[in-house]
């Protein structure tokens, strides 16, 4: 957890199979610029160092690998009106020598690095050869030992919160344009070059808002570049990861299911997400979402504004949007046959109880969820602090006998609700592509609420 560790195999694999990011360093060429600038002295030739915050600081994660293949993609200068000039050839060693014309200009240094992100020993979700390592180290050993049980005892494989893994661990608000590194690979570079043309390197700085000229032309161009980048990226994720894993499973007589992180808009962002909910899960045999830790609550569409960990809680999305993501993918993708899965009940604490679990089940059933993965049974001694409630808890859960009644009820209702085609009278546009172009785009939960 999260999916992508591949049994630790990436610790010993070639650098080319590991995760990679791109970054930008921007520097205004003001009145004190005299025609030369030492890029090394200004620390513009490497990614800006950041201290871990939030969950990364709490977990005190240490880099699993350190890489020495950092490189510069290109160096450009941007004029406030939108004009860009490639000055890569004007750099002598680490010194820029360029006569600045009149006007306001910003230096942009774009580079790529593998020394970014919290999980540097995980597969690169955009590289098919890297994703194949997950098959070789986890899936194929299962086939080797238990092939006779595939399709019988072993129903399939579950991907749990696979991530692109750039930026900070579980970062919030990481819309396109914010100060973060972005996922990269040779595959993405080739596709982006083909889509944007020979001047693609000069367009890369538009992926970030920092010091972006306040010009309508520039903003339109930036929206185009960001949309193309995310389109290329998420199609690579779909093909390299989701379709490849799902294809292997079906070839071996089992299903492929799971979910990504959907919280706080992550379903259409990088970082802890896969950039696009539908593309990220397109190779699966069921759609999937996760309700955990007080996300869905009775009358919880407005309050509370924070979860149990003190992080922001978007109750409007959890109440109106979460289950609809899974239902939509299950209905519009023939391969899923209407099957929408939800991992449910986990980490609500011991106060959850059967009454709240019944509410959660009903909430999800009427919104199109047909398959459930209850979270979680724990073999650890009671009380295990890891994400309770635990349904048996070695006999310490007094409501466990009634949990069986709830499961029987959910099975009966889900059998009925999944027995025919859903007829939708209203269509809501998935806002992923709109947010890539404009971070102020209305999220889908707003019209769903109305």
Whereabouts are the PLM-identified features?
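Acidic/aromatic-lined carbohydrate-recognition and catalytic surfaces
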Residues: 1-88, 98, 112-132, 136
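Catalytic grooves of carbohydrate-active enzymes
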Residues: 103-145, 346, 414-418, 423-441
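Carbohydrate-binding surfaces of carbohydrate-active enzymes
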Residues: 1-37, 146-156, 161-450
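Generic recognition of long tandem-repeat/solenoid scaffolds
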Residues: 93-99
């Amino acid at each position: 957890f999260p999916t992508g560790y591949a049994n630790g195999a990436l610790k010993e694999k070639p650098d080319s199979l590991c995760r990679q990011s791109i970054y930008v360093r921007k520097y205004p060429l003001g009145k004190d610029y005299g025609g030369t600038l030492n890029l090394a002295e200004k620390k513009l030739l490497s990614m800006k160092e950041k201290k871990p915050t939030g969950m990364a600081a709490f977990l005190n994660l240490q880099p699993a690998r350190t890489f020495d293949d950092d490189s510069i993609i290109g160096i450009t200068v941007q004029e406030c009106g939108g004009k860009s000039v490639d000055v890569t050839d004007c750099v002598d060693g680490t010194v820029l020598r360029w006569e600045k014309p009149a006007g306001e200009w910003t230096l942009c240094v774009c580079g790529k690095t593998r020394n970014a992100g919290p999980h540097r020993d995980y597969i690169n979700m955009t590289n098919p050869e890297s994703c194949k390592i997950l098959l070789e180290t986890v899936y194929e050993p299962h086939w080797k030992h238990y092939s006779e049980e595939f399709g019988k005892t072993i129903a399939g494989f579950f991907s749990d919160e696979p991530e692109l893994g750039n930026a900070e661990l579980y970062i919030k608000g990481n819309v396109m344009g914010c100060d973060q590194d972005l996922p990269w690979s040779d595959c993405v570079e080739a596709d982006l070059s083909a889509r944007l043309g020979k001047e693609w390197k000069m367009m890369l700085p538009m992926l970030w808002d920092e010091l972006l000229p306040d010009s309508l032309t520039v903003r339109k161009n930036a929206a185009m570049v960001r949309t193309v980048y995310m389109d290329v990226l998420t199609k690579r994720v779909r093909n390299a990861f989701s379709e490849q894993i799902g294809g292997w499973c079906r070839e071996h007589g089992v299903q492929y299911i799971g979910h990504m992180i959907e919280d706080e808009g992550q379903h259409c962002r990088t970082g802890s997400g896969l950039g696009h909910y539908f593309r990220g899960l397109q190779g699966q045999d069921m759609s999937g979402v996760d309700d955990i830790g007080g996300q869905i609550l009775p009358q919880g569409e407005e309050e509370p504004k924070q979860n149990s960990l003190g992080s922001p809680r978007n109750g409007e999305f959890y109440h109106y949007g979460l289950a609809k993501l899974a239902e939509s993918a299950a209905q519009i993708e023939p391969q899923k046959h209407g099957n929408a899965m939800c991992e449910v009940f986990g980490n609500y604490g011991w106060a959850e109880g059967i009454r709240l679990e019944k509410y959660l089940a009903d909430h999800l059933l009427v919104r199109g969820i047909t398959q459930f993965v209850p979270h979680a049974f724990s073999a650890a001694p009671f009380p295990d602090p890891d994400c309770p409630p635990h349904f048996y808890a070695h006999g310490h859960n007094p409501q466990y006998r009634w949990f069986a009644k709830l499961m029987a009820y959910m099975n009966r209702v889900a059998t009925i609700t999944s027995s025919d085609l859903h007829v939708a009278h209203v269509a809501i546009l998935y806002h992923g592509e709109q947010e890539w172009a404009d971070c102020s785009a209305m999220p889908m939960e707003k019209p769903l609420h109305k």
